Amino acid sequence: MVNVERYEIFLDFNEYSYEGMEKIKMKSDGEKVELDSVGLEIKEVKADGKQVKYETKNEKLIVYSKVNEELEIRFSGKADNKSILGIYVAPYDGNYLITTQFEPIYARKFIPCFDSPDMKAVFKLSVRVNRGQKVISNMPIISIRDDGEKIVYEFDETPRMSTYLLYLGIGDFEEISDESKKPKIILATTPGKSKRGIFAIEVARKVIDYYEKYFEIPYQLPKLHLIEIPEFAAGAMENWGAITFRESALLADESSSVSQKLSVSAVIAHELAHQWFGDMVTLKWWDDLWLNESFATFMAYKSLKEIFPQWESEGHFIYDETLSALTEDSLLNTHPIETHVKDPHEIEEMFDNISYGKGASILRMIEAYVGEEVFRRGVVNYLNKFKFSNASGSDLWNSISEAYGSDISQIMAEWITKPGYPVITVNVEGDSVEFFQRRFTLLNVNDSTIYKVPLTFEVNGKRQTLLLDKESVKLNFDNAVSSIKVNLNRTGFYRVLYKPFELSFSSTLNSYEELGLVNDYWNFLLAGLESIKTYLTLIKRFSNTRNSFLSREIAFELMTLYYINKDKYYSIARDFLLNQIKIYRNAKDDLGKMAYSSIIRSLAIVDDDFALGLSNLFQYYEQLDSNIKGAVAIAYAISTSDFNGLLDKYKSFNSDEEKLRMIDAITNIRDKSIVEKLAMLVFNRTIKYQEAPHVINSLSNNPYVREELCNFLQGNFDMIKQFVVTVAGMWGLFYIIRGPMIMCGVNKPEETIEFLDRIKTKEIARSVEITKEYIKVYNRVKNLDL
């Protein structure tokens, strides 16, 4: 048994390297203590003031002594310049900064520690650096003192927190701040970029105000840093009081597109939710990772609904979170929301649409079931009860149950411990309605799993609710059923199949219900439950829609068909997109602008004549509306194949928002040589390491270079695997297997599946099986008769 109270850490940096001294206030009752330690040189260990024996093996520092009061460790470490995990070097413009990324298990690469979320402690940090360097950590600086040729920054002690939330940044940071009220909000960037952070500070202030009101608990630290990191594996990280971001996830200004502003706002809101839910109250173990991530996702959209009502964040939640999660959870190789994690190295595979999107969607479903205010009171009680401590999912359900006055834990247990979800088949006969449930899978496999489904539906205009906890139920009504719709406002995590299909049009649907209906029937097409004729009939019904979410969804579905078989589905995609352009061309509202941006981008890819016309605008690129810049760049790339011109443009830009547009454009060039050219740009870091998975995935959607890409990936897989895992962790490898290899399997299914089986290891087994499922599904759709 080990009880840890406090870490006192002193680090002396000399460029990338550092000497460390830490004193850990702790107590152990065994004859040895095991700490986590990776890549650190341990020089001396003292227990209660006396030198003791120790050894390092299997990512552990083993100290052969009982500890009654204090463990003192002298060690050295080095910021990694090949990886972007742990403590690492992030280069930019001929300079660099040192930064950290510890979630889930990388604090052990920084200091010897008990690197587990339940081992909370207070951290007191002091750092000695060269003059001219600035240092940022979780807490405010309490002193800066000269120390010879260097300067020592001393930080205030943190509240009790987990190791994965500790942060250290060293570099030439440029800062702007908002000190209008507590907490002080500071935005830190690399030189020359801070002015693009004003929008982020404004969003952060509004979101904090919203959360303080919702949670009835003030933000707990004196300050909050929002930090732009030039190389970053994740999108952002919720280090308590020192949140780190990719540039593209933090910076936006008046020149940015609507989608960029929305994305930045959503990421900031997500990470700020963690300051309460994840940082102040933390999961006990990684089994409950989903609770951290799903709640932050859920709350982010709630806050944006209040702050930016014009963006209709609930629609974005359904589009970006629920629909993505439903798709991933349709696989036989999905996993329950709550997954038992034995080996910490398994954790990274849990950062997926199930932990984020499905978990958040289940929270939305339960909120709809118990009511918004009851749900909020349950959350407030939970946060107060476990403040500065650790908790589990069952603790949250108990708090919500207390507020509700009835036990919901059984319903929640159904949804977090069982994989998948049901399709609800709706049959109407005269004055009766029958609901029938079975698990939905894209491979259409029989599965007898029964879920407790909070059904919401409307019969003849009257709202109804039902907890469907068996295979089927038949309801009788006073009058013949003339209209019905199921899954109101799309709060439920299930699909709805109407028998006959025409029932789906019997009621008036709102924009979210239309979105859900079309996505359901798209997936029924993929699963072979409905014909291509039925699907296209549905799409035709919405060909003139002004529902921006629906327009983007149909465009996405038709583009997927195009990527699977461009010759067969080209005209279907083109005709829909051409019609939609007329509707959104002069859109003034933000959602309309987003839809127009998506539609012209897609049309440029499928229609060469349209691309040629649109490409003429590229000469005026800097003066263009930011919402169409991406589409114009892609059109130019397709029409000219001007790799060098686009690369020069990429190098000339100072913002990642613009650089990413150029990357997307280059990946659409229809010249096979771009595969090797782009690979070299990533390997030599002209394109940031963090973009490697994105570059490969974007290339795989280009049918003109796909075969070349697949040959490159398969022929160099061991080298690519080592590179991606080194620079971005296992997540990057999962991304490459699940994205590009699926499209390789569209071209050559047998060869790709054989390759996947050959490279399959324990770490990537689930990703391999997921990819094989998609290959089977897409090849069935590829060969449908129109």
From Swiss-Prot:
Predominant subcellular localization, coarse grouping: cytoplasm
Pfam families cross-referenced by the UniProt entry: ERAP1_C, Peptidase_M1, Peptidase_M1_N
PROSITE patterns: ZINC_PROTEASE
Keywords for this protein: Aminopeptidase, Cytoplasm, Hydrolase, Metal-binding, Metalloprotease, Protease, Zinc
SUPFAM superfamilies xref list: Leukotriene A4 hydrolase N-terminal domain, Metalloproteases ('zincins'), catalytic domain
Domain of life, per lineage: Archaea
Gene3D superfamilies: 1.25.50.20, 2.60.40.1910, Neutral Protease Domain 2, tricorn interacting facor f3 domain
GO molecular function: metalloaminopeptidase activity; peptide binding; zinc ion binding
Site (Transition state stabilizer) residue list: Y356
GO cellular component, one term: extracellular space
Cofactor, free-text remark: Binds 1 zinc ion per subunit.
GO annotation (BP), single: proteolysis
Residues at the active site: E271
Subcellular location: Cytoplasm
Residues bound to Zn(2+): H270, H274, E293
Family per record: Belongs to the peptidase M1 family.
Record protein name field: Probable aminopeptidase 1
Gene: ape1
